[in-house]
Amino acid sequence: MVVRDYNTELTYIERISTNSFRIKKGFQPNMNVEGIFYANSRLEKLMFDELRNSCRPGMTGGFLPGVKQIANVAALPGIVGRSVGLPDIHSGYGFAIGNMAAFDMSDPTSIVSPGGVGFDINCGVRLLRTNLFEKDVKPVQEQLAQSLFDHIPVGVGSKGIIPMNAHDLEEALEMGMDWSLREGYVWAEDKEHCEEYGRMLTADPSKVSMRAKKRGLPQLGTLGAGNHYAEIQVVEEIYDKYAASKMGIEELGQICVMIHSGSRGFGHQVATDALVEMEKAMKRDKIETNDRQLACARINSVEGQNYLKAMSAAANFAWVNRSSMTFLTRQAFAKQFNTTPDDLDMHVIYDVSHNVAKIEEHIVDGRPKQLLVHRKGSTRAFPPHHPLIPVDYQLTGQPVLVGGSMGTCSFVLTGTEKGMAETFGSTCHGAGRSLSRAKSRRNLDYKDVLRDLEAKGISIRVASPKLVQEEAPDSYKDVRDVVQTCHDVGISSKCIKLRPIAVIKG
C-alpha cells in the first residue's frame, strides 16, 4: 500500500457543495466508483483530522480513517453509483459505520460483505407514542424509570423473561414479528409500522449455527449493553406539523418511548461464522479487496446465499427482541398509570433497522435495477408514495428514527426523493462516535457523566455504571449537526425533535 503525505491525500478529495465531498478514483487502489461523504464544517474537521493523523509516520494498527474505508468499499466488485459516507460516519470493521453501498444483483461478480452490515445485525430503533404529557409523567418520573428498568432485562449478560425454548426460537427466527403477534406480544398494527413489516422472508434458520442459537436463546427480549437503551422522551420541537400529525404527534410535551437494540450475541455469532466461510470463498473465487476486513463472497455463491439467509434470521431475531421489549414497556406504563396500554395510546410510530443488507429496486443510469443495498450505521429513508412504506406515511415519506447519544436529543426525520436519487434512499442513523470506547474510558469519569445527566433532570438507570463513560455525549459527534447536514443536503427532512427525561441502559 502506498503511503502518501496528507497534502497529497487531499488532492483526491474535492468539495462538491457546502456539505458534500467527492472522493476521486485513485485515492485507494482499484476503485470502481467514486466515493461521496456529507459533513458540515464541524463534522468535516473531524473527518480531515482523522485522515491527517493516519498520515503521520509510524501510525499503524486500529481501523483505517473513515474516508479510506469509503474508498476501499468503492473498490468492491459489483458496486454501483457511489460509496456513500453519511454525516455520522466513523471507523468500523471493514465498512465504516455510516457507510452505505449498493451492488448490482445482475452482475455475477457482485458481492455481499458481513462488514457492510456489522456484527449487530438489525440493530435498530422503535418509537412508541403515548397520549401522556410531561406534566403527567414528571411527578412519577423516577418510579416510571425504575419500573421500566425492572421490566426490561438490561446489561451484558442479561437473560430474557419471555418464555422461550429451542423450538420457539426456530419459529421466531423464521417468522419475525409474525411470531410475536401469534404469541400475543404485539398488536396487529405494530407490524404495519415496521420496516419489512418486521419479517425478512428470506430467513432460513437452518443456515444458522448451533452456537449462534445457543447464544441467542436466553437473550430474546433483552436490551443488552453498549449504546443500546430505552428512553422516555418528550416532544420538544415539531418541524413538520403535517408529517408529525400522521405519526400521532400533535403537541409539544407529548411523551414517547424509544427502544434501541439489536440481535445481541446471536447476530454477532452469525457475522463471525460468515466471515470464516467467506475468507475461504475469497481464496477459491480469487476475490481481492483492499482490506482483509472486507471479507466477502459473490452474492450468488453458496456462502453468499447462506449468509443472506442467516442474516435475515438475525434481523427477525432483532424485531422479535424489540417487540418483546415493546410488550414489557407497555406493561410498565400500564402498571404505573393503573390503566391499559390501549388507553395510553401506546402505538408504534415506526421501527427502523440501522444495520442490514436488503434487495431493493433503484434507478441506476435511468433504468430500474435490483440491488443489494448494504446499510451499516445508516437508515432506509424512502420518499412519499414509495410502495414499501405504510399507507399512513404515503404522503409524508418513511419515518426515520435517529437516536442521539446518552442524554442528548433524538430526531424523527422523513425520507425524500433526493435521498432516493443520491443515496439509494438512505440517511444517517445517530450521532456517530468521535472518541473510541478505549479513549472514552481513559478520558471520562462515569461519575461525572451520571452527575451531568442528573443536572439535566434526566432519570438514569444503568446496569453497568462503569460502561457509562463509553456512551457519554462527549464520546459522540453532535447529533444536531448530523441531522441538520442530512436536512441541508436534502437526503432527509427534519420532522420531530425529542428530549430524554429518563434513560435505561445496560
Swiss-Prot record:
Cofactor: Mn(2+)
Keyword tags: GTP-binding, Ligase, Manganese, Metal-binding, Nucleotide-binding, tRNA processing
EC number: 6.5.1.8
Gene Ontology BP annotations: tRNA splicing, via endonucleolytic cleavage and ligation
Any single Pfam family the record assigns to this protein: RtcB
Reactions listed under catalytic activity: a 3'-end 3'-phospho-ribonucleotide-RNA + a 5'-end dephospho-ribonucleoside-RNA + GTP = a ribonucleotidyl-ribonucleotide-RNA + GMP + diphosphate; a 3'-end 2',3'-cyclophospho-ribonucleotide-RNA + a 5'-end dephospho-ribonucleoside-RNA + GTP + H2O = a ribonucleotidyl-ribonucleotide-RNA + GMP + diphosphate + H(+)
Entry binding sites for GMP: 227-231, 354-355, 403-406, 410, 429-432, 505
InterPro entries the UniProt entry points to: RtcB (IPR001233), RtcB-like_sf (IPR036025), RtcB_euk (IPR027513)
Top EC category: ligase
Textual note on the cofactor: Binds 2 manganese ions per subunit.
Task performed by this protein: Catalytic subunit of the tRNA-splicing ligase complex that acts by directly joining spliced tRNA halves to mature-sized tRNAs by incorporating the precursor-derived splice junction phosphate into the mature tRNA as a canonical 3',5'-phosphodiester. May act as an RNA ligase with broad substrate specificity, and may function toward other RNAs.
Family membership noted in the UniProt record: Belongs to the RtcB family.
Protein name listed in UniProt: RNA-splicing ligase RtcB homolog 1
Organism in which the protein naturally occurs: Culex quinquefasciatus (Southern house mosquito)
